[in-house]
Amino acid sequence: MKASEEEYRLNFFIKNDFKRKICKSCKTPFWTRDEKKEYCSDIPCTDYYFFDINIKSQPLTVKEAREKFLSFFEKRGHTRISPKPVLARWRDDLYLTIASIVDFQPHVTSGLVPPPANPLVVSQPSIRLEDIDNVGITFGRHLTTFEMAAHHAFNYPDHYVYWKDETTAYATEFFTKELGIPEEELNFKESWWEGGGNAGPCLEVTVGGLELATLVFMQYKITDNGNYTPLKLKIVDTGYGVERIAWITQKTPSAFHAIYGNLVYKFFNKIGVAYIDETLLKVASRFAGKIDPDNPDTIKIHRQMVSKELGIDIKAVEEELDRAAKVFQILDHTKTIMLMLADGLVPSNSGEGYLGRLVIRRALKVLRLLKSDVRLYELVKEQIDFWKEDFPQVLKNKDYILDAVELEQQRFEKILEKVPSIASTLARKSEITTEDLIQVYDSNGIPPDLLEEELKKKSVKFELPRNFYALVAKRHQTSTIKSVYDKVKLPKDMLEYITALQPTEKLYYKDQYMRSFEGKVLGVYKNYLILDKTTFYPEGGGQLGDTGLIIDEKSSKRYEVIDTQKVNDVIVHILKEEPSTIKVGDNVRGEINWERRYRLMRHHTVTHVILAAAKKVLGEHVWQAGAEKTPEKGRLDITHHKTLTEEEVKLIENYANSVISDRRPVKPLEMNRMEAEMKYGVSIYEGGVPNSATIRLLEIKDWDIESCGGTHVSNTSEIGAVKIINVERIQDGVIRLEYVAGPALVDYIRETEAKIVEASKIIGSSPDQLTSRLRRLLNEIEEKNNLIIQYRRIIETELLNNLKPYEINGNKIYIIEGLGDEEENKEILRKLTSTDNTIAISISDNRLQIATSKNMRVDKIVEELLKGGGKGGGKGTFANVILNSKKSKEEIIEIVRKSL
């Protein structure tokens, strides 16, 4: 949508003598107080000339720039709020926090819940991977991690806060009064913003070639057919670049120097590469606005401009700038890695973990291209020491961060062993496409840059896309949201039937111990029954739906409820048979299977207990990746970067049982969504993100609080005790814990006792002597195995010394009948065929093992053998064959003769 000029013709501009100009280069309208200005002061229309602007502000570090911004707006009636994590775990459609507005999407921006303050100010650390391939090349214009300082105002129909004029006035005052940028250097470039289904006009604030801020006025909703409809809630969505504010005040050769200070020089030193000539860097940075990373020709032109300006050979310029760009990439990526892991990301092959691993592996690839032997965790450690005051969580989670990074490097080094074989496979293709490279990366984790080296050896050329990592990240940066209808186990016609029915009153929230109730029938469809109220809990949050009975009060007929499901707020009772005596309007009585429900309640509550215990033992990076509660056992999947040790499992179990024996109260709470987030953080969403203004929390006193809609015991003592019965790694970065509690634990103990008694009987021992008896048996078996090995060696030696070969056309053929197991045979055959022109065959009934010396081909013999029927095959000098019928030694020799 192209906004009209009137959208930007603000009273503020008119009153303060701003003139609307058209940029001579890009033809975009912009507002300025400099009547002589011809360009919009944005790149590529101009170079970075902010180096020459007299700015009154003292040089600001990132920390000082952040505080100056926050304090400025705090003094002007804005409430300072804490930033959210860089992992957008309050969203089910997005993995990373890419901007400050994400903090309030979708529930505040949709009007479902009020903002935490209005107006407010925040400095939100953000991560965007769409520019990952451009980092370093543009001297700091592109970063994967940055702080978006923002002030937001939410204008409701009945509550106006402020809009365009005030927002523009704030920007002008901040940049000219607080930073001391000359008023004539400040420009407001007209633009248009769209994102997250919303849109609106925006103004880009440019100074000396740098875009310092974007002022978005979110006022339209984009409909499914692409039309724009006005929003009732109009939002001021601003974004000021904290790092760019630091850069423009410091005027350092690159933004990296402004962001990282002395860490820049330390990284060059630790990585083991020479620091770049600073004069060259300053000139290159000034001309950097000419670089469009999507157009490689502009990079070449930029290098030529630097070469000409300094009178330096262009190859020397390219070498210096390429080396510096790689170090800048490592600086940027290690900070991103640090923030991701500090907020709980566990590297893996899916979800947010995939994106974390992508950044780690790109950093490792760059280190490899620089031929550096520094360990990546050493560089991340430097980042932690540098940023620990700004981001306390990085110091708190330091051990996990460094451990996870080192483990990822070890895995990456192991993966690189596959490069030659992967390159050989690719080399056989007539053309290597970008899709091929992405598939190789997704399947094997091998960066195309490293494949390129190997493919060059094979004289294979391919085009490496400059934005490869951005392409890969784009495929994985969002999560597919399942429709509510995709999550339920009901047929489509049933889903259509219930759309007109009113919400069901949830009696299980009023009293989780209610076993029976009376309700009115609102709907009957096949074997599905809908009531006005129910105490049957529908499947959700990993807890199975209740079972029980529905009793027709007229006929007293009892119908078995085999499952309970929910669609939106309508609860559906699934009966074993169609309720022939029940019709709409009837009154019925419901009785849940209480013993089953109580087991589910115990297993659900203990899941919360174990999750908090796992965090305590393993670290705050642990996050619930899935859960299931059945009457028989509970299951919890957690994110963790390595297999659990026995000691860690014991500690988790001990903490859980300690909480159970402490008799801690378990209390459900209902809170305003935003209030809950502000008070407890986004960890309340471990079990999922509810779509409601008010959310239900479960609090285990002084232990855990989490959003949960399940049914629970009211005190941890009701759980009885818990035992973790199984721990396994189910996928990369995810560990599964299975456990039993209460009566299920008693069942488990009885079953285990029965197995011990049975095992004792089998080996002729009593249960209390089972261990010692087993140990003796194993020692005896080991002794006998050693004896068997000795006898086999004697037989093998005797066989090799006395076995006479058949001679066929100068070839030796050894035939062995009915000897040992396959591995033993293979070793004997290998020894027999150690000299040229030798074939050895082991026969066991209709099974053959065939070996040949290196100068012969086993496949020809196999081919001849299979002519008579059978199956088998081999590779190189060894094969296995199963014939349809047993053949004599003489018949096999004849077949071999034919193959020769």
UniProtKB/Swiss-Prot annotation:
**Reaction equations catalysed:** tRNA(Ala) + L-alanine + ATP = L-alanyl-tRNA(Ala) + AMP + diphosphate
Source species:
Saccharolobus islandicus (strain M.14.25 / Kamchatka #1) (Sulfolobus islandicus)
Residues crossing the lipid bilayer are none
* Textual note on the cofactor: Binds 1 zinc ion per subunit.
User: What is its subcellular localisation?
Assistant: Cytoplasm
Instruction: Cite the NCBIfam families for this sequence.
Output: A-tRNA_syn_arch (TIGR03683), alaS (TIGR00344)
Q: What is this protein called?
A: Alanine--tRNA ligase
A GO biological process of this protein is: alanyl-tRNA aminoacylation
Question: Domain text from the record?
Answer: Consists of three domains; the N-terminal catalytic domain, the editing domain and the C-terminal C-Ala domain. The editing domain removes incorrectly charged amino acids, while the C-Ala domain, along with tRNA(Ala), serves as a bridge to cooperatively bring together the editing and aminoacylation centers thus stimulating deacylation of misacylated tRNAs.
